[in-house]
């Protein structure tokens, strides 16, 4: 069996990936100009900028922070990269947008980035694969020992609905109000190896799992395991991929700070010989559905005995509990933004409010999202 080496990584470092949709500033439609944008931002020898990259769809670019010790530093890095992208997109009349789904675009109008990897994915997944018109925020946290990675993954599943509800930003799909806060959460899990992770107890179990998938042709390597929360052996991190796309730097910072603090807390518990609290897989699955459906109004299961609480109350209390850790990690201001989201509304709530105030116009929803990304919530 092939062994998966877990790279050395400084403990509790942070890196953030932010996927951005390219939209016509006048119509709000998606525009497939990623190749042109990346070409102008690339290196002199024709390679992509190392921190501004392509994605599955040609209407998307991704900005990727370097590895940082604090969330504020990672956010500043991302904002600088977005500024570079705007130098190319602004003259073209193209705006940047980030929500987990585009409110009215149709999947069959979108062009795929030429890539053997993407061709293989779509050949296998067909209709479901073509539906992946989604944009997200991924947060990596450095793990200092390989054997801590899977307990951290399992522990973070307890807080999955908190992060899903806080970031939920996909109430619309192809012009329809889905009735869900995060339609994306239930769409993405249709892909093979996507969705909730298996709760493995040891690294050897994960290696056996990946080997089984490679042997049977499900994946070519571990990077094609697309769990919502996964170990990333290449970087020596745990990667949180459950969050919907977020349209402001403050919201990205809030979610990243919450993930940073939770992971650091669990690392400390593991140092003390205490495994993070985990929930039964059936509770984890139910929590994912509840957060996707009801967002911040979801009542979620918070303990192995089946105790339930309103997720917004959980988030408010959790933010206070983690405040000392946030101070130590240098992200107190960002973690406090969780309270702001609870007070002013998550993205899905703001989008629904804009649509209602404008006679159901989804073009106005796109306009509000692009304005948020450019100017913040004010």
Swiss-Prot record:
Its EC number is 6.3.2.2. GO terms for molecular function: ATP binding; glutamate-cysteine ligase activity. InterPro entries: GCL_type2/YbdK_subfam (IPR050141), GCS2 (IPR006336), Gln_synth/guanido_kin_cat_dom (IPR014746), YbdK (IPR011793). It catalyses: L-cysteine + L-glutamate + ATP = gamma-L-glutamyl-L-cysteine + ADP + phosphate + H(+). Keywords: ATP-binding, Ligase, Nucleotide-binding. Belongs to the glutamate--cysteine ligase type 2 family. YbdK subfamily. ATP-dependent carboxylate-amine ligase which exhibits weak glutamate--cysteine ligase activity. This is Putative glutamate--cysteine ligase 2. It comes from Leifsonia xyli subsp. xyli (strain CTCB07).
């Amino acid at each position: 069996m092939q062994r998966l080496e877990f790279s050395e990584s400084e403990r509790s470092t942070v890196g953030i990936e932010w996927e951005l949709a390219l939209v016509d500033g006048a119509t709000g439609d998606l525009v497939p100009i990623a190749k042109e944008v990346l070409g102008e931002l690339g290196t002199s020898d024709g390679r992509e900028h190392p921190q501004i990259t392509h994605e599955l769809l040609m209407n998307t670019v991704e900005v990727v922070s370097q590895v940082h010790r604090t969330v504020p530093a990672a956010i500043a890095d991302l904002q600088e990269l977005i500024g570079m992208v705007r130098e190319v997109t602004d003259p073209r009349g193209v705006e940047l947008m980030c929500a987990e789904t585009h409110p009215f675009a149709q999947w069959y109008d979108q062009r795929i980035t030429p890539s053997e990897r993407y061709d293989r994915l779509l050949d296998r997944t067909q209709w479901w694969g073509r539906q992946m018109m989604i944009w997200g925020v991924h947060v990596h946290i450095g793990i200092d020992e390989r054997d801590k990675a899977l307990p951290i993954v399992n522990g973070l599943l307890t807080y999955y609905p908190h992060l899903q509800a806080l970031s939920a930003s996909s109430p619309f799909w192809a012009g329809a109000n889905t009735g869900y806060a995060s339609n994306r959460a239930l769409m993405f899990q249709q892909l093979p190896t996507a969705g909730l992770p298996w709760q493995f107890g040891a690294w050897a179990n994960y290696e056996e799992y990946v080997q089984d998938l490679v042997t049977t042709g499900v994946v070519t390597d571990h990077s094609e395991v697309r769990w919502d929360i996964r170990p990333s052996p290449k970087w020596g991190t745990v990667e949180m991929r459950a969050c919907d796309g977020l349209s402001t730097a403050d919201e990205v910072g809030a979610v990243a700070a919450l993930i940073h603090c939770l992971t650091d807390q669990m690392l400390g518990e593991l140092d003390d010989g205490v495994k993070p609290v985990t929930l039964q897989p059936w509770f984890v699955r139910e929590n994912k559905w509840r957060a996707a459906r009801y967002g911040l109004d979801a009542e979620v299961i918070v303990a192995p005995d089946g105790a339930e609480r309103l997720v917004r109350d959980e988030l408010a209390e959790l933010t206070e509990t983690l405040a000392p850790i946030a101070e130590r990690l240098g992200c107190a201001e960002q973690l406090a933004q969780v309270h702001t989201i609870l007070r002013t509304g998550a993205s899905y709530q703001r989008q629904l409010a804009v649509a209602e105030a404008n006679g159901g116009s989804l073009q106005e929803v796109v306009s509000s999202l692009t304005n948020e990304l450019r100017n913040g919530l004010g």
